[in-house]
Amino acid sequence: MAAQPFILTIDGVCPFCYKIRLIVSRRITMRAPFQILAIPYRIVDGTPMYCVFHRADHDQWQFIAGGGEDNETPLAAAKRETFEEGGVHSTQWLGLKSLSYIPVTIISEMRRKHWDSSTYVIPEYTFGFECQDDVRLSPEHTDCVWLTYDEANQKLKWDSNRTALYELNCRLKKANEKEA
């Protein structure tokens, strides 16, 4: 009998000892042909602040990013990735119109082997979410910082992140004007 494959996933970090809790499961997920980008924000003294993450595997700053699994919707994938990478949940999500396409070559061949062979680019759906909780970094990141729009715009590596940040900042400013 062949050995069954297993998946080792991070369940979270113990709030008492800060050890990472792991789950071993036999469920193998299929990578969906889309990417998500999730932008954490909070309003501090009337000013939107954005949390930017430093990648552990590359010297670059970006927002939370990842791919869909199985039949997840982009929003469900964004919520899952947000918890996996930042340890936070939010009930305030805003779907953005910013949409980029990225080359499939950023996804490992193993993860995209079930995709149609004519798939060369995949969409990157973007979301903003209100983040009131403290961020708990996953091993995918070495640091995160809360920045103003201008500071975040300067620090971000990818144009798609800056474009989505611009849209979210415009939407938050407009919402703030309506409340005033």
PLM regions and their residue ranges:
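Active-site segment of metal-dependent pyrophosphate-handling enzymes
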Residues: 87-133
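Short connector loops at helix/strand junctions that flank enzyme active sites
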Residues: 33, 63, 120-124
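NUDIX/MutT-family hydrolases
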Residues: 124-166
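Conserved Nudix-box catalytic region and its N-terminal flanking loop in Nudix hydrolases
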Residues: 47-91
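Short, positively charged and aromatic/hydrophobic N-terminal segments
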Residues: 7-9, 16-22, 26
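Conserved N-terminal beta-strand and adjoining loop/helix that marks the start
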Residues: 29-49, 70
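Residue-level signal for short segments within beta-strands and strand-turn junctions
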Residues: 40-42, 54, 130-131
